[in-house]
Regions:
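Contiguous, non-catalytic segments that form substrate-binding/exosite surfaces or channel walls
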Residues: 1-51
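Conserved helix-loop functional segments at active or binding sites
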Residues: 6-17, 40-43, 72, 76-84, ...
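Short, glycine/acidic-rich hinge or "gate" loops at secondary-structure transitions
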Residues: 17-23, 82-89, 108-123, 221-228
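Short pre-active-site segment immediately N-terminal to the catalytic Zn-binding motif
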Residues: 45-67
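Short beta-alpha connecting loops at secondary-structure transitions
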Residues: 51-55, 82-92, 121-130, 149-151
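Post-HEXXH active-site segment of zinc metalloproteases
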Residues: 64-65, 76-100
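C-terminal, non-catalytic "cap/extension" segments appended to globular domains
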Residues: 66, 74, 104, 112-118, ...
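Post-HExxH zinc-binding segment in Zn-dependent metallohydrolases
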Residues: 90-118, 127-129, 133, 207
Length: 276
């Protein structure tokens, strides 16, 4: 709790007070238990405070998961307090922005405070893995999905062999010639449930990019950026998601936020290479 609160200090006292309320008033089911489902999520209803499920073991990943889920919860808290029921839930396009923004602020704080080389490398590696899984991998998923729809429109039969060969080619394209792809990876598409919700996965990549851009603005500008960000959190679904993000200072109709996120990725890779 202390690490997360320290990392989120740039958000200002009002945000920290909501965070503290959640920590001290049993919003969170913290530990593993018999019969409890795995993973983590944030939920609740319009007239209740948010609820968070964790399976906390004290690992670094668990700390980031706490920051992530509390990002969802504070987003829901602001939205429900400031919008009527009909507009109180936010759209999928912005659903991962607040959670990932928290993670970006936390990694910045932890890297700033540690001088231990091994710890720095562990932190950077953790965030790079998150980056790879959220931007590169989800973009690959989205391109795969697009190609499948394109083939269907052209009247090509979507046999298991056709789908698998396309998926394998994309893996080889995205991960490059230096990565040896097992043939079995060609079948991975069949175990990814997100493909049953058409054009869902690309929003992970756009949300992550927006979150990186917003966290950078908060760290660089301070209070003015925080106020714009809180306006976004309070917006629920009262505006188009693109327009809501514009109120926070991020224009997702341009390539700039995505490029800025890729620049952060490159910078972190450079830092890791210097330490090896």
């Amino acid at each position: 709790k202390k690490m997360v609160a320290e990392g989120l200090k740039p958000m200002g006292q009002e945000y920290l007070d909501i965070l503290k309320e959640g920590f001290e008033n049993r919003w969170i089911d913290v530990y593993e238990n018999e019969g409890k489902r795995s993973g983590a999520y944030s939920g609740g209803s319009y007239d209740s405070h948010p609820y968070v499920l964790l399976n906390y073991r004290g690992t670094l990943d668990n700390v980031f998961t706490l920051a992530h889920e509390m990002g969802h919860s504070v987003h829901s808290y602001y939205s429900r307090k400031n919008q009527p029921y009909a507009y109180s839930d936010y759209k999928i396009f912005v659903a991962e922005v607040a959670s990932t923004c928290n993670e970006a602020l936390l990694i910045h704080d932890l890297l700033k405070k540690t001088s231990d080389k091994a710890m720095k490398m562990t932190l950077i590696n953790h965030f790079l893995d998150k980056f790879k899984g959220t931007i590169y991998r989800q973009t690959m998923f989205a391109e795969f999905e697009y190609l499948m729809h394109q083939k269907a429109q052209e009247g090509k039969p979507l046999t298991a062999q056709e789908i698998s060969s396309t998926y394998l080619e994309l893996n080889q394209l995205y991960f490059g010639p230096d990565m040896v792809s097992d043939q079995e990876i060609a079948l991975e598409w069949s175990r990814i449930p997100h493909f049953y919700t058409p054009f869902y996965v690309y929003q992970y990549a756009t949300g992550f990019s927006a979150a990186i851009a917003l966290s950078n603005k908060i760290l660089e500008e301070g209070a003015p950026a925080v106020e714009r960000y809180k306006t976004f959190l309070k917006g629920g679904s009262s505006m188009d998601p693109i327009d809501l993000l514009k109120t926070a200072g991020v224009d997702m109709t341009t390539s700039q936020p995505v490029q800025a996120a890729l620049d952060v990725f490159g910078s972190l890779v450079d830092q890791m290479e210097e330490m090896i």
